[in-house]
Amino acid sequence: MTNKHTARLLGSCLLRLPAYSWLVLVFWALIIAPVQAAVELRIAISKGVSAVSVGSSTDAVVKDGAGRVLGELTAMNALNANPRGKAVGLADWQASQLIIEPENDGYVWINDRWYRGRTRIIRQGSGVTALNLVDLEEYLYSVVGAEAIPSWPQEALKAQSVAARTYALYQMNTSGNRIYDLDTTTRTQVYKGLESEFTSTHEAVKATAGQIMSFNGKPILAVFHSSSGGHTENVEDVWNSPLPYLRGVIDYDQVAPVFQWSKNFSARELGRLIGGVGRVRSLSPERTTPHGRVIRMRIVGDQGSKLISDTQLRRILELRSTLFTISANNGTFAINGRGFGHGIGLSQWGAFSLADQGVTYDRILSHYYQNASLTEMSPEVPR
């Protein structure tokens, strides 16, 4: 027999969701009602945490991993899910995984945001992981608004929609034994749920519904970045294997606010940030791409030297890209760079500039994804 949890206080694990959230929910309910999922993605919202707050905008059914109904959650109340032995605990329920399914086209609450779709909570490591199970097209309403600027021309937002759809599908098809397809960060694609949905992103996603970039009949690895600094890169020059559709091309991103940038460091500050070399005496690129992007850097200090990768360099020095030059003067190192991101695939600011000049999204995509074709998704996508 099922039981419905009401607003009674269950220790500190039950709380009333913010009343203002109803304004957001009503607005998006009027804009578009969710449709039944055709391709469902698994988005990791929280991974291996000690507790995660979950809820629903409407009454919701709680099921175990086998689909058995365990009970119901009352609308607009949040519960904390946490580890219980080898299971997940949520109020009086306990199972290896729990699924929350809103009724009447409701939305799910995970930690501090509203999302479309359903919630799955699983036991992982010493904690629990919360996944948002969401339709691919509805996922894109949020991603396009988080990755691009909603006020951009529709053709730029359409290009972003196709790129993000293709990337998500590629990740889903290659996720293997992972329990999720994508997360919410720049490691995959930024995803903020209803918070980053806009009328313009809905329009762009719907106008390109089901369209992807493909090569040999398969979704491509449709990576993108903010600004290349004038020219994108061949993928093998920055990462590993060559791909026929990720080729370096002229970029049109000169309007980007991140097209040029600079940072200054003292020799002592660099030594502290890099560690193990003492006061820095020189920074010398040991490997660069044909367009000048640093892939490997030699740092020499008064106590030793170190060879670091482009990824480490960006993280340690918080650089927008590794396309830069270095000049030293009286113990100060000036780094003058261009662009923001890895410089491979679609340039978002380049797409903006082209769209602003009247170029259509299909031509934008053809420029940045050489040799790839704009096609329709196949009706069934195997996991």
Residue ranges with predicted function:
Residues 2-383:
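Conserved, single-site charged/polar hotspot
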